Amino acid sequence: MLPQRLHPSRLLALALFSLVLGLAGCQTKPPQTGLSAEQIAVLQEQGFELRDEGWEFGMSSKVLFGNNLDRLNPDSRNTLTKIARALLAVDIDKVRLEGHTDNYGDEGYNQKLSERRAESVAAVFREAGMPAANIEVRGLGMSKPVADNKTRAGRSENRRVAIIVPAE
């Protein structure tokens, strides 16, 4: 017996149904952070935003540095101490610190400078009580600018340390 031909409207309906099923299977799941509602509320209160790799402080709020400097000013130290204590108060005791530079200077020098910047933030977190073993320090040099390095304001935005509470 020969197979029956499908009516064009049924064929179209079958094709659309298959397409919908295929697309539904491709949906990206939201990141699972493993954090409580209280922890998320504290992260948001402190200025963290949810990104692909976790909760990041350093997008709308930044820890900025002067040109060729790796030392924190007193206001930045106070802000960082407040953040570290707030995180620890809700049992968030693991962070990644990513230091960055603008594009002025030698690539190797900027790499080391970005590491020193991240380490200066790590020192404040350790002083606030965060275990040293739970603080990951990365220097990314000038590889990930968030602003145009052609302007003074852009270069200033790129001299920063991002604080990330990893998604687990």
Swiss-Prot record:
Q: What is its main location?
A: membrane
Q: According to the record, what happens upon gene knockout? A: Deletion of the gene does not affect attachment or colony morphology.
Activity control, per UniProt: Both lipid anchor in the outer membrane and peptidoglycan binding are required for full activity. Once activated by certain cell stress, the dimeric YfiB transforms from a compact conformation to a stretched conformation, allowing the periplasmic domain of the membrane-anchored YfiB to penetrate the cell wall and sequester the YfiR dimer. GMP enhances the binding affinity between YfiB and YfiR.
Q: Does the keyword Ribosomal protein apply?
A: no
Q: Where are the transmembrane segments?
A: none
State whether keyword Magnesium applies: no
Q: Which InterPro entries match?
A: Bact_OuterMem_StrucFunc, OMP_bac, OmpA-like, OmpA-like_sf
| GO aspect biological process, one term | bacterial-type flagellum-dependent cell motility
Which top-rank group of organisms is this from? Answer: Bacteria
Bilayer topology term? Lipid-anchor
The compartments listed are:
Cell outer membrane
> Where is the OmpA-like domain positioned along the sequence?
53-168
Per UniProt, the keywords (alphabetical) are:
Cell outer membrane, Lipoprotein, Membrane, Palmitate, Signal
For this protein, the record's Pfam families field holds: OmpA
Q: Where is the lipid attached (S-diacylglycerol cysteine)?
A: C26
* Gene Ontology CC terms: bacterial-type flagellum stator complex; cell outer membrane
Lipidated residue numbers (N-palmitoyl cysteine): C26
Matches recorded under CDD domains: OmpA_C-like (cd07185)
The entry assigns this protein to a family as follows: Belongs to the outer membrane OOP (TC 1.B.6) superfamily.
The record describes its quaternary structure and partners as:
Homodimer. Interacts with YfiR. The YfiB-YfiR complex is a 2:2 heterotetramer.
Present the record's domain note.
Dimerizes via its N-terminal region.
**How is this protein named in the record?**
Outer-membrane lipoprotein YfiB
